[in-house]
Protein backbone atom coordinates (compact mmCIF):
# COMPACT_ATOMS: atom_id res chain seq x y z
CA UNK A 1 0.00 0.00 0.00
CA UNK A 2 1.64 3.24 -1.15
CA UNK A 3 0.09 5.44 1.52
CA UNK A 4 3.27 6.84 3.04
CA UNK A 5 5.88 8.30 0.71
CA UNK A 6 9.17 10.13 1.04
CA UNK A 7 7.55 13.30 -0.26
CA UNK A 8 6.46 16.05 2.09
CA UNK A 9 4.22 19.04 1.55
CA UNK A 10 5.46 22.61 1.26
CA UNK A 11 2.92 23.83 3.79
CA UNK A 12 0.97 22.61 6.80
CA UNK A 13 -2.10 24.07 8.53
CA UNK A 14 -1.60 24.81 12.24
CA UNK A 15 -4.10 26.51 14.55
CA UNK A 16 -5.68 28.55 11.79
CA UNK A 17 -2.54 29.46 9.85
CA UNK A 18 -0.75 28.08 6.81
CA UNK A 19 2.94 27.76 7.71
CA UNK A 20 5.99 26.14 6.08
CA UNK A 21 6.13 22.42 6.80
CA UNK A 22 9.58 22.67 8.43
CA UNK A 23 8.33 25.23 10.96
CA UNK A 24 5.59 22.98 12.38
CA UNK A 25 7.56 21.90 15.45
CA UNK A 26 6.97 21.31 19.16
CA UNK A 27 9.30 20.80 22.11
CA UNK A 28 10.47 17.23 22.78
CA UNK A 29 8.84 17.38 26.22
CA UNK A 30 5.48 18.38 24.82
CA UNK A 31 2.67 15.89 24.59
CA UNK A 32 3.03 15.69 20.81
CA UNK A 33 0.71 14.41 18.11
CA UNK A 34 1.57 10.74 18.78
CA UNK A 35 0.67 10.92 22.47
CA UNK A 36 -1.91 8.93 24.34
CA UNK A 37 -4.46 11.69 23.87
CA UNK A 38 -3.94 12.47 20.17
CA UNK A 39 -7.03 12.30 17.92
CA UNK A 40 -6.73 12.12 14.14
CA UNK A 41 -8.62 11.53 10.91
CA UNK A 42 -7.60 10.10 7.53
CA UNK A 43 -9.01 11.63 4.35
CA UNK A 44 -8.11 11.25 0.68
CA UNK A 45 -8.39 13.52 -2.31
CA UNK A 46 -8.25 12.14 -5.85
CA UNK A 47 -7.06 13.89 -8.99
CA UNK A 48 -9.17 13.53 -12.14
CA UNK A 49 -6.91 14.37 -15.09
CA UNK A 50 -9.72 14.57 -17.63
CA UNK A 51 -11.78 16.97 -15.52
CA UNK A 52 -8.68 18.76 -14.18
CA UNK A 53 -10.16 18.57 -10.71
CA UNK A 54 -9.06 17.36 -7.29
CA UNK A 55 -11.90 15.76 -5.34
CA UNK A 56 -11.80 15.36 -1.57
CA UNK A 57 -13.78 12.19 -0.95
CA UNK A 58 -16.50 12.27 1.70
CA UNK A 59 -14.95 15.22 3.48
CA UNK A 60 -18.07 16.00 5.52
CA UNK A 61 -18.36 12.45 6.86
CA UNK A 62 -14.70 12.33 7.83
CA UNK A 63 -14.94 15.69 9.60
CA UNK A 64 -18.04 14.54 11.45
CA UNK A 65 -16.16 11.47 12.69
CA UNK A 66 -13.23 13.69 13.71
CA UNK A 67 -15.53 15.97 15.70
CA UNK A 68 -17.24 12.99 17.34
CA UNK A 69 -13.86 11.70 18.51
CA UNK A 70 -12.97 15.13 19.89
CA UNK A 71 -16.29 15.25 21.73
CA UNK A 72 -15.66 11.86 23.37
CA UNK A 73 -12.31 12.97 24.84
CA UNK A 74 -13.78 16.33 26.00
CA UNK A 75 -11.23 18.57 24.33
CA UNK A 76 -11.50 22.34 24.35
CA UNK A 77 -12.36 23.08 20.73
CA UNK A 78 -13.79 26.17 19.05
CA UNK A 79 -13.73 25.17 15.37
CA UNK A 80 -16.89 24.21 13.50
CA UNK A 81 -17.12 21.57 10.81
CA UNK A 82 -17.32 24.38 8.23
CA UNK A 83 -14.11 25.88 9.64
CA UNK A 84 -12.36 22.54 9.17
CA UNK A 85 -13.84 22.13 5.68
CA UNK A 86 -12.42 25.49 4.63
CA UNK A 87 -9.07 24.75 6.29
CA UNK A 88 -8.64 21.51 4.32
CA UNK A 89 -9.33 23.28 1.02
CA UNK A 90 -7.03 26.15 1.98
CA UNK A 91 -4.19 23.72 2.66
CA UNK A 92 -4.67 21.79 -0.58
CA UNK A 93 -4.63 25.03 -2.57
CA UNK A 94 -1.56 26.33 -0.73
CA UNK A 95 0.32 23.17 -1.73
CA UNK A 96 -1.02 23.44 -5.30
CA UNK A 97 -1.90 19.76 -5.43
CA UNK A 98 -2.90 18.33 -8.78
CA UNK A 99 -2.39 14.69 -7.87
CA UNK A 100 -3.77 12.21 -5.35
CA UNK A 101 -3.33 13.40 -1.77
CA UNK A 102 -3.68 11.96 1.73
CA UNK A 103 -4.93 14.46 4.34
CA UNK A 104 -4.53 14.00 8.09
CA UNK A 105 -6.12 16.40 10.60
CA UNK A 106 -5.03 15.72 14.16
CA UNK A 107 -5.41 17.35 17.54
CA UNK A 108 -3.66 16.99 20.89
CA UNK A 109 -3.64 18.82 24.20
CA UNK A 110 -0.99 21.43 24.83
CA UNK A 111 1.35 20.70 27.69
CA UNK A 112 4.06 18.36 28.91
CA UNK A 113 4.13 14.58 28.98
CA UNK A 114 3.75 14.54 32.77
CA UNK A 115 0.36 16.25 32.39
CA UNK A 116 -1.10 13.30 30.48
CA UNK A 117 -2.35 11.52 33.57
CA UNK A 118 -4.20 14.61 34.77
CA UNK A 119 -7.84 14.81 33.70
CA UNK A 120 -8.24 18.32 32.29
CA UNK A 121 -11.48 18.62 30.30
CA UNK A 122 -11.50 21.63 28.02
CA UNK A 123 -7.72 22.13 28.14
CA UNK A 124 -6.25 24.10 25.23
CA UNK A 125 -5.33 22.09 22.17
CA UNK A 126 -3.13 22.16 19.09
CA UNK A 127 -4.92 21.49 15.80
CA UNK A 128 -2.87 20.43 12.79
CA UNK A 129 -3.80 19.47 9.23
CA UNK A 130 -1.04 17.66 7.36
CA UNK A 131 -1.03 16.28 3.82
CA UNK A 132 1.20 14.37 1.45
CA UNK A 133 1.03 12.93 -2.08
CA UNK A 134 0.32 9.24 -2.51
CA UNK A 135 0.05 6.81 -5.40
CA UNK A 136 -3.44 5.39 -5.80
CA UNK A 137 -2.25 2.65 -8.14
CA UNK A 138 -3.00 -0.80 -6.76
CA UNK A 139 -2.23 -4.15 -8.35
CA UNK A 140 -5.36 -6.08 -7.40
CA UNK A 141 -3.59 -9.34 -8.22
CA UNK A 142 -1.34 -8.88 -5.20
CA UNK A 143 -3.51 -10.35 -2.45
CA UNK A 144 -2.51 -10.63 1.21
CA UNK A 145 -1.49 -13.68 3.21
CA UNK A 146 -3.11 -13.09 6.60
CA UNK A 147 -3.41 -14.84 9.96
CA UNK A 148 -5.82 -14.73 12.85
CA UNK A 149 -4.00 -12.88 15.61
CA UNK A 150 -3.57 -14.10 19.18
CA UNK A 151 -3.98 -10.49 20.30
CA UNK A 152 -7.57 -9.58 21.27
CA UNK A 153 -9.15 -6.49 19.77
CA UNK A 154 -9.82 -3.61 22.18
CA UNK A 155 -13.45 -3.17 23.24
CA UNK A 156 -15.83 -0.23 23.57
CA UNK A 157 -15.65 -0.25 27.37
CA UNK A 158 -11.84 -0.39 27.45
CA UNK A 159 -10.47 1.76 24.61
CA UNK A 160 -13.42 2.36 22.28
CA UNK A 161 -12.54 1.58 18.63
CA UNK A 162 -15.19 4.13 17.62
CA UNK A 163 -12.72 6.74 18.85
CA UNK A 164 -10.08 7.42 16.16
CA UNK A 165 -7.14 8.00 18.43
CA UNK A 166 -3.43 7.28 17.99
CA UNK A 167 -3.19 5.13 21.11
CA UNK A 168 -5.89 2.72 19.87
CA UNK A 169 -3.66 1.80 16.95
CA UNK A 170 -1.05 0.26 19.22
CA UNK A 171 -3.40 -2.69 19.72
CA UNK A 172 -3.33 -3.39 15.99
CA UNK A 173 0.38 -2.68 15.78
CA UNK A 174 1.12 -5.49 18.24
CA UNK A 175 -0.92 -7.87 16.10
CA UNK A 176 0.72 -6.64 12.89
CA UNK A 177 4.24 -7.07 14.28
CA UNK A 178 3.49 -10.64 15.33
CA UNK A 179 2.00 -11.41 11.92
CA UNK A 180 4.99 -10.05 10.00
CA UNK A 181 7.48 -11.87 12.24
CA UNK A 182 5.55 -15.11 11.58
CA UNK A 183 5.79 -14.58 7.82
CA UNK A 184 2.33 -13.16 7.10
CA UNK A 185 1.41 -9.83 5.53
CA UNK A 186 -1.30 -8.79 7.96
CA UNK A 187 -3.50 -10.03 10.84
CA UNK A 188 -7.22 -10.37 11.45
CA UNK A 189 -8.25 -9.60 15.02
CA UNK A 190 -10.97 -11.25 17.12
CA UNK A 191 -12.92 -9.75 20.00
CA UNK A 192 -13.05 -11.15 23.53
CA UNK A 193 -15.78 -13.61 22.44
CA UNK A 194 -13.79 -14.94 19.51
CA UNK A 195 -15.80 -13.08 16.85
CA UNK A 196 -14.14 -11.44 13.84
CA UNK A 197 -13.58 -7.69 14.12
CA UNK A 198 -11.16 -6.09 11.62
CA UNK A 199 -7.51 -5.69 10.73
CA UNK A 200 -5.18 -2.97 12.03
CA UNK A 201 -6.44 0.17 10.32
CA UNK A 202 -8.92 -1.48 7.95
CA UNK A 203 -12.33 -3.14 8.11
CA UNK A 204 -12.84 -6.70 6.91
CA UNK A 205 -15.58 -7.98 4.60
CA UNK A 206 -16.08 -11.47 3.23
CA UNK A 207 -18.14 -13.10 0.50
CA UNK A 208 -20.11 -16.32 0.93
CA UNK A 209 -22.39 -17.71 -1.79
CA UNK A 210 -22.58 -14.39 -3.60
CA UNK A 211 -23.42 -12.34 -0.51
CA UNK A 212 -21.10 -9.78 1.10
CA UNK A 213 -20.93 -10.10 4.89
CA UNK A 214 -19.56 -7.53 7.34
CA UNK A 215 -19.25 -7.52 11.13
CA UNK A 216 -21.59 -4.89 12.65
CA UNK A 217 -20.35 -1.57 14.04
CA UNK A 218 -20.76 -3.03 17.55
CA UNK A 219 -18.05 -5.63 16.82
CA UNK A 220 -15.12 -3.56 18.12
CA UNK A 221 -14.51 -1.82 14.79
CA UNK A 222 -14.06 1.76 13.67
CA UNK A 223 -17.19 3.23 12.09
CA UNK A 224 -15.69 3.24 8.63
CA UNK A 225 -16.62 5.83 6.00
CA UNK A 226 -15.19 3.59 3.29
CA UNK A 227 -17.25 0.64 4.47
CA UNK A 228 -20.46 2.69 4.33
CA UNK A 229 -19.50 3.77 0.81
CA UNK A 230 -19.08 0.12 -0.20
CA UNK A 231 -22.52 -0.74 1.20
CA UNK A 232 -24.09 2.00 -0.93
CA UNK A 233 -22.24 0.84 -4.05
CA UNK A 234 -23.29 -2.77 -3.44
CA UNK A 235 -26.93 -1.73 -3.27
CA UNK A 236 -27.15 1.01 -5.90
CA UNK A 237 -24.47 0.16 -8.46
CA UNK A 238 -23.55 -3.51 -8.24
CA UNK A 239 -26.86 -4.99 -7.00
CA UNK A 240 -24.97 -7.44 -4.79
CA UNK A 241 -26.73 -8.48 -1.56
CA UNK A 242 -24.99 -7.78 1.74
CA UNK A 243 -25.61 -8.08 5.44
CA UNK A 244 -24.08 -7.01 8.73
CA UNK A 245 -23.83 -9.75 11.36
CA UNK A 246 -21.40 -11.44 13.70
CA UNK A 247 -18.72 -13.48 11.91
CA UNK A 248 -17.09 -16.61 13.32
CA UNK A 249 -13.37 -17.28 12.90
CA UNK A 250 -14.02 -20.45 10.92
CA UNK A 251 -16.11 -18.53 8.39
CA UNK A 252 -12.84 -17.01 7.23
CA UNK A 253 -11.65 -20.51 6.34
CA UNK A 254 -14.67 -21.27 4.14
CA UNK A 255 -15.23 -17.81 2.61
CA UNK A 256 -15.25 -17.45 -1.17
CA UNK A 257 -13.57 -14.04 -0.97
CA UNK A 258 -12.17 -11.78 1.76
CA UNK A 259 -10.97 -8.20 1.49
CA UNK A 260 -10.04 -5.24 3.69
CA UNK A 261 -11.46 -1.75 3.13
CA UNK A 262 -10.42 1.63 4.47
CA UNK A 263 -9.40 5.14 3.48
CA UNK A 264 -5.74 4.18 3.34
CA UNK A 265 -6.17 0.62 2.13
CA UNK A 266 -9.05 1.36 -0.24
CA UNK A 267 -9.78 -2.25 -1.33
CA UNK A 268 -7.18 -4.90 -0.48
CA UNK A 269 -7.86 -8.58 -1.32
CA UNK A 270 -6.88 -11.55 0.85
CA UNK A 271 -5.38 -14.70 -0.69
CA UNK A 272 -5.19 -16.92 2.41
CA UNK A 273 -6.01 -17.07 6.12
CA UNK A 274 -3.77 -19.15 8.39
CA UNK A 275 -2.27 -20.75 5.24
CA UNK A 276 -5.71 -21.84 3.98
CA UNK A 277 -6.43 -20.41 0.49
CA UNK A 278 -9.42 -18.09 0.21
CA UNK A 279 -11.48 -19.19 -2.78
CA UNK A 280 -8.95 -19.96 -5.47
CA UNK A 281 -6.15 -18.22 -3.59
CA UNK A 282 -6.41 -15.08 -5.70
CA UNK A 283 -8.53 -11.93 -5.91
CA UNK A 284 -12.18 -12.83 -6.39
CA UNK A 285 -14.62 -11.44 -8.99
CA UNK A 286 -16.83 -9.59 -6.50
CA UNK A 287 -13.79 -7.95 -4.90
CA UNK A 288 -12.65 -6.78 -8.34
CA UNK A 289 -16.08 -5.36 -9.15
CA UNK A 290 -16.19 -3.49 -5.84
CA UNK A 291 -12.69 -2.09 -6.36
CA UNK A 292 -13.59 -0.85 -9.84
CA UNK A 293 -16.83 0.77 -8.67
CA UNK A 294 -15.06 2.41 -5.75
CA UNK A 295 -12.28 3.78 -7.94
CA UNK A 296 -14.77 5.31 -10.35
CA UNK A 297 -16.81 7.04 -7.67
CA UNK A 298 -13.87 8.51 -5.70
CA UNK A 299 -12.32 10.02 -8.84
CA UNK A 300 -15.58 11.36 -10.26
CA UNK A 301 -15.61 9.04 -13.28
CA UNK A 302 -18.91 7.83 -11.86
CA UNK A 303 -20.80 11.06 -11.26
CA UNK A 304 -23.35 9.56 -8.91
CA UNK A 305 -23.41 10.98 -5.39
CA UNK A 306 -21.76 14.33 -6.17
CA UNK A 307 -22.19 15.22 -2.48
CA UNK A 308 -19.42 12.72 -1.73
CA UNK A 309 -16.83 14.69 -3.70
CA UNK A 310 -15.71 18.18 -2.69
CA UNK A 311 -13.93 19.89 -5.61
CA UNK A 312 -10.84 21.90 -4.76
CA UNK A 313 -10.14 23.81 -7.97
CA UNK A 314 -13.73 24.51 -9.00
CA UNK A 315 -14.02 28.15 -10.23
CA UNK A 316 -15.28 30.44 -7.52
CA UNK A 317 -14.20 28.30 -4.59
Residue ranges, per PLM feature:
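Helix-start/capping segments and mature chain N-termini
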Residues: 1-79, 86-90, 117-317
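Short, glycine/charge-rich beta-strand/loop segments that flank catalytic centers
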Residues: 80-90, 100-115
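Short secondary-structure junctions
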Residues: 94-101, 238-240
